[in-house]
């Protein structure tokens, strides 16, 4: 028989982590389900990316976010969020994609690729980065086509089109 969680959170980005911390502070049993790795979207940001926000504005869970510059880098953010989940001892199941949410009595059942989890409440904190919009034009599924910016180096002295 499955444990029944007070809250199941889908997504381990900053919003999902923040929700889990607040739930833990209020003594709710909480599970985070993540289809990829911790802060999966941030991991897929361009390698040398710098955030627009200051580290102070990105802090969560009462854990200071110390950066070498006024605005943190992607790598600093990845390290920071690792420290946050370790400090708060959050229960996270990585590489376990939620596939459906169903009603179950007074609560919900969240189905994943590995099983099911019963809970009283569900928070969907999946973000928007994975939800790019295709244009349905010829060639957009070719291997050379990118739907996200990743790095400029491979495109130096090349003809490119940005839409």
Q: Model-flagged regions — what are they?
A:
Residues 2-5, 9-35, 148-163:
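Rossmann-like dinucleotide/flavin-binding elements
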Residues 20-22, 43-44, 134-138:
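Short amphipathic alpha-helical segments
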Residues 29, 91-93, 144:
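Conserved beta-strand segments of alpha/beta enzyme cores
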Residues 29, 43-79:
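Glycine-rich active-site loop/strand segments that organize a redox cofactor
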Residues 37-39:
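Helix N-cap at the beta1-alpha1 junction of Rossmann-like dinucleotide-binding domains, i.e.
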Residues 73-131:
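Feature captures the FAD/FMN-dependent oxidoreductase FAD-binding
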Residues 127-163:
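Glycine-rich dinucleotide-binding loop and its adjacent helix/turn
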């Amino acid at each position: 028989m499955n444990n029944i969680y007070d809250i199941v959170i889908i997504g381990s980005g900053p919003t999902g982590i923040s929700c889990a911390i607040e739930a833990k502070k209020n003594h709710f049993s909480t599970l985070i389900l993540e289809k990829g790795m911790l802060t999966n979207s941030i991991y897929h940001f361009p390698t040398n990316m710098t955030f627009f926000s200051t580290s102070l504005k990105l802090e969560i869970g009462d854990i200071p976010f110390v950066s070498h510059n006024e605005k943190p880098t992607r790598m600093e953010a990845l390290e920071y969020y690792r420290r946050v989940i370790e400090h708060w001892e959050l229960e996270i199941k990585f590489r376990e994609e939620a596939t459906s949410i169903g009603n179950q009595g007074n609560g919900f059942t969240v189905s994943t690729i590995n099983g099911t989890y019963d809970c009283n409440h569900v928070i969907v904190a999946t973000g928007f980065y994975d939800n790019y919009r295709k244009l349905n034009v010829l060639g957009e599924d070719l291997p050379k086509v990118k739907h996200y910016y990743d790095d400029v180096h491979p495109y130096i002295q090349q003809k490119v089109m940005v839409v």
